Amino acid sequence: MLFATLEHILTHISFSTISIVITIHLITLLVRELGRLRDSSEKGMIVTFFSITGFLVSRWVSSGHFPLSNLYESLIFLSWALYILHTIPKIQNSKNDLSTITTPSTILTQGFATSGLLTEMHQSTILVPALQSQWLMMHVSMMLLSYATLLCGSLLSAAILIIRFRNNFHFFSKKKKNVLNKTFFFSEIAFFYAKRSALKSAPVPSFPNYYKYQLTERLDSWSYRIISLGFTLLTIGILCGAVWANEAWGSYWNWDPKETWAFITWTIFAIYLHSRTNPNWKGTNSALIASIGFLIIWICYFGINLLGIGLHSYGSFTLTPK
């Protein structure tokens, strides 16, 4: 009872904090004079991280196994993984371009996990025999870490497509200022504008194209690095799952719906990484492939759980009639 109460408190603290964080983030986008509030949002993300970590540890101690046995626990772990990605730019002492992706993603996963739809999964239960293995932590954690990384990388690629295909792209138009112009990738304007002295010889109309090129190149670089990391984690997760499947079911691969879509996901991002070796496919073409991968990941992770079919149906989400 004590652990259940603690988990309930920590979960709602993390959700409430991340809600405040995203509100602050939106305010700073709309009102540039309140830019100092970003420090508060970063502190809020730290509180969220420790709350989610506390929940996972509490769940681990109370249940006796790593908390990855159902959709509810995996969503909490996914939000924790998104925060880890949120801290990567800080470790590299670079601008946190990922915050506009990781913060909303965290609140969405956290919000769905704490919603009434998954109430029956909130209580920890004894593992089913198929999950009573040391491979549980290795396989599932690698898969969820890869999902979080690939989702962020795919969203960055989608941002590239939005920038390149957006009509009437003007950075300095006073009549067309909106939230999109002030999100993480457009905030780079201030950085380049500070160095405008080196570009005084260039005509004014060339500025938007120059900024557009610089921003897309930066996003493309981030997307490639994050997807490369996610692809590596996905490969490790699939290999661990194959070994575990051989121990549990006597076969490395069974073409279960979850396994099939994991293979499709792996193939899509393998094509993306291969396309990066061809200069003609870099940029828009590779970003399009990664954007398709975004939908494939959600089908693999969430869609199969909705159907509740196959060998991976335990811990799935089903709507119960009232």
From Swiss-Prot:
Statement: the UniProt record of this protein carries the keyword Acetylation: no
Record keywords, A-Z: Chloroplast, Cytochrome c-type biogenesis, Membrane, Plastid, Thylakoid, Transmembrane, Transmembrane helix
Location(s), subcellular: Plastid, Chloroplast thylakoid membrane
Segments crossing the lipid bilayer: 9-29, 44-64, 68-88, 143-163, 226-246, 260-274, 289-309
One GO location term (cellular component): chloroplast thylakoid membrane
Any one GO biological process: cytochrome complex assembly
GO MF annotation: an example: heme binding
Principal location listed in the UniProt entry: plastid
Known partners and oligomeric status: May interact with Ccs1.
Function according to Swiss-Prot or TrEMBL: Required during biogenesis of c-type cytochromes (cytochrome c6 and cytochrome f) at the step of heme attachment.
Protein's recorded name: Cytochrome c biogenesis protein CcsA
Native organism: Hordeum vulgare (Barley)
